[in-house]
Design a protein with these regions (language model features):
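Conserved C-terminal RecA-like helicase domain
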Residues: 1-28, 35-58, 71, 75, ...
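Short beta-alpha junction loops
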Residues: 10, 33-34, 63-65, 107-109, ...
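Short glycine-/polar-rich loops that comprise or flank the Walker A/P-loop
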Residues: 55-56, 98-100, 282-292, 319-324
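Hydrophobic/aromatic beta-strand patches that form the interior of the parallel beta-sheet core
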Residues: 58-60, 101-103, 120-124, 293-295, ...
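Conserved helicase ATPase motor motifs in RecA-like P-loop NTPase domains
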Residues: 63-70, 80-117
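A short helix-turn-beta junction within AAA+ P-loop NTPase domains corresponding to the substrate/partner-engaging
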Residues: 115-133, 287, 293
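C-terminal helicase lobe and adjacent C-terminal extensions/tails of nucleic-acid helicase motors
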Residues: 152-156, 160-162, 179-198, 317-386
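Conserved SF2 helicase motif VI
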Residues: 282, 292-321
Length: 386
């Protein structure tokens, strides 16, 4: 990173930086994957190019498995807006004589590797303090009744009370499913009724509606309200349930506020947002509140990439000395572990092929069979495996 300038696309001093850019050979611009920020980035790139002729651009998409990678770039009518913008970005910059390379970063790159055959694949190094899948303690669970979940929560609170920790309960149904289903709101309400028995300091629900939180002790509730009022954060309250718009607060800061209110063990209930690339860790520098336990009840047909992404919320480098525990069915755990073993075989084969992915490479590997689809059915990955 010598002679490299790293900034965000929203940096208010960007123009003045460009005017005095003689000392920089490389610019790194960080942005969100949405059409507005992609357009802003294109404008910044052109501004730099006009000042100092750019030789090349590298677009790096994190969570690359969810980025649309259409084969036919001339027909993007039915593609997401961000994808259209990236195609437009690539074409316009190429027309100006700038070389463009695209890199997709993903822990679950199946739809990239199986279908799109990238020209080169890098296996990124894993930090020594990384807590991986092999460090997760599996506890078979088939009874997801309120009584059984309450007992598990009480046990986890006893085990985590000194060290602290966050419990994630990834449920089968979304917030808007039938009221008789075991959906997020029903699970949330059931656990609130048993909050005293669990010993949890706080119960939260995290989804597209925002963040809901209930505290066991009045003292912690008062501290939290005082905290968010001091920060001028908007909230509503209904029957002791505090509601915060997730657009007003990032999840790491929210957990940081809970930690500041002396919350040691916290439960978060959710579904889709837990299955994505979000780190459930507070923003505290020292001993951050970290997801260390997961109770997982996915649907019977949920694909293995989603299983891996959800259970992956327990992995990482935060609080690496704390034990991790997973409560789920034997079917889920076996598919998860088989999926990871298959990944190892694929990466090994690609490495032996000079890090290139040939058309027949995947189909030539003897992969272990799973009882669930590899990825979304619309991708039809299984046909590329046989």
């Amino acid at each position: 990173f010598k002679n490299c300038f790293i900034t965000t696309v929203d940096n208010k001093n960007f123009d003045s930086i460009v005017e005095n850019m003689e000392e920089y050979n490389t610019f790194v611009i960080c942005l969100l994957d949405n059409k507005t920020q992609i357009q802003k980035t294109y404008e910044k790139i052109i501004s730099i190019h006009e000042q100092k002729q750019l030789g090349s651009i590298c677009i790096i998409n994190d969570e690359g498995d969810v980025v649309t990678k259409a084969r036919n770039i001339t027909d993007v009518a039915n593609q997401p807006e961000s994808h259209k913008k990236w195609i437009e970005f690539t074409q316009k910059t190429s027309d100006r004589g700038i070389s463009v390379k695209r890199v997709f970063v993903s822990a679950t790159p199946e739809n990239v590797v199986y279908i799109h055959k990238p020209g080169y694949l890098w296996d990124l190094p894993i930090p020594l303090n990384y807590v991986g899948h092999d460090k997760i303690n599996f506890n078979e669970l088939n009874d997801f009744s309120t009584g059984q979940i309450t007992r598990i929560l009480a046990r986890e609170v006893r085990l985590r009370k000194q060290e602290g920790g966050m419990i994630l309960y990834c449920v089968e149904r979304n917030k808007d499913s039938d009221e008789n289903d075991n959906n997020q709101m029903k699970v949330f309400n059931d656990i609130i009724l048993n909050l005293k028995q669990t010993g949890l300091d706080a119960v939260t629900m995290y989804n597209s509606d925002g963040i809901k939180v209930v505290f066991r002790l009045k003292k912690q509730k008062t501290m939290f309200i005082n905290k968010i009022e001091t920060l001028d954060l908007k909230y509503t309250m209904d029957n002791n349930i505090i509601n915060v718009n997730k657009k007003d607060i990032v999840i790491s800061k929210f957990y940081g506020y809970l930690q500041s209110c002396d919350c040691k063990v916290v439960l978060t209930i959710g579904k889709d947002l837990i299955s994505r690339g979000i780190s459930f860790v507070s923003d505290h520098k020292e001993n951050p509140l970290t997801a260390t336990t997961m109770i997982y009840k996915p649907g019977n047909q949920l694909h293995c990439v989603a299983l891996c992404q959800a259970i992956g919320r327990l992995t990482g480098t935060a609080q690496s000395k704390l034990s991790r525990r997973l409560y789920t069915t034997d079917d889920v755990y076996n598919n998860y572990m088989t999926f990871i073993e298959n990944q190892k075989e694929i990466i090994k084969a690609i490495k032996e092929n000079v890090n290139k992915v040939d058309d027949s490479l995947i189909s030539d590997i003897a992969l272990w069979k799973m009882s669930r689809p590899v990825d979304r059915k619309t991708l039809k990955l299984e046909k590329d495996m046989v």
